[in-house]
Design a protein with these regions (language model features):
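A short, Lys/Arg-enriched amphipathic alpha-helix followed by its capping loop at the start of a domain
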Residues: 26-39
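N-terminal glycine-rich "phosphate-gripper" loop used for MgATP/nucleotide binding
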Residues: 46, 54, 58-135
Length: 203
C-alpha cells in the first residue's frame, strides 16, 4: 500500500481493439461508482495506437454522447510502469513524442501503484499480453492471469482445453482463413454438419 491511507488503483481503459469506445464507456461507469474514500484513483488511457497517457478524472468525458463513443487521445506526455517496482512515471517530450528526433525533457514520478483494474476489451487487453506486463512490473491486477487470459481469448483453444479436461462443450468446427480460401465449399460442408443456426466467433 502507498504511504497515503488509501491504496492506489490504476484504472486502465481504451486500447487497440475495435472495442475502444466501449472500454472508455466502461471506465466512465467505474470512475463514477468507485468509492473515493477507500481508493486513490488514477485513470490511465491507452490510445488506439497503443500510447499510454494520463487522462482527466472526468467520467462524463468518457461516456457515449448522442450515440457517439469517446476515444483516448495523446498529447506531449506518455505514461509507463517501471518493471519490477510498480511505479508509475509520466514522461514529457519536446515536440511530437512519436517523432524519431523527440527527446524526454521531464519525468514525473506518479508514485507506486497498488493494484491495476484493466477495463480493456479484445486483443492487447483480454489476451494475456497486458497481464504479462503487469506481472513483470510486479503489480497486482483484477481479473484472470496470463495463461487463462490467453487460452480464453482463443475460442478454439478454449474448447480444446475444456474438452481435454472432460468438460462437456458444444460441437464446433474451426475454419481457418487458409482453409476457406483453399476450398470454401468443403468448409461449408463441415459447418452444415453442425446444423443451423450456428454461432460464428472469430478467434
Amino acid at each position: 500500500m502507498t504511504a497515503i491511507s488509501r491504496p492506489r488503483v490504476l484504472i486502465v481503459f481504451g486500447g487497440r481493439s475495435s472495442e475502444h469506445e466501449i472500454s472508455c464507456s466502461t471506465a466512465a461507469g467505474i470512475l463514477t461508482a468507485i468509492d473515493r474514500t477507500k481508493w486513490d484513483v488514477i485513470p490511465l488511457g491507452i490510445t488506439r495506437d497503443g500510447q499510454w497517457v494520463r487522462v482527466a478524472d472526468d467520467p462524463s468525458a468518457l461516456e457515449f454522447k448522442d450515440g457517439k463513443g469517446q476515444s483516448v487521445t495523446a498529447g506531449s506526455t506518455r505514461v509507463a510502469l517501471t518493471p519490477g517496482e510498480g511505479n508509475l512515471v509520466e514522461l514529457t517530450y519536446e515536440g511530437d513524442p512519436d517523432a524519431p528526433e523527440s527527446r524526454v525533457v521531464g519525468v514525473e514520478d506518479l508514485g507506486h501503484v497498488d493494484i491495476v483494474f484493466p477495463l480493456l476489451h479484445g486483443p492487447y487487453g483480454e489476451d494475456g499480453t497486458i497481464q504479462g506486463l503487469f506481472e513483470m512490473a510486479g503489480v497486482r491486477y483484477v481479473g484472470c492471469g496470463v495463461t487463462s487470459s490467453a487460452v480464453s481469448m482463443d475460442k478454439h483453444l478454449t474448447k480444446t482445453v475444456l474438452a481435454a479436461a472432460g468438460i462437456d462443450v458444444g460441437h464446433w468446427e474451426l475454419v481457418t482463413a487458409r482453409q476457406w480460401e483453399a476450398d470454401a465449399s468443403a468448409c461449408m460442408d463441415r459447418i452444415e454438419r453442425l446444423g443451423f443456426p450456428v454461432f460464428v466467433k472469430p478467434c
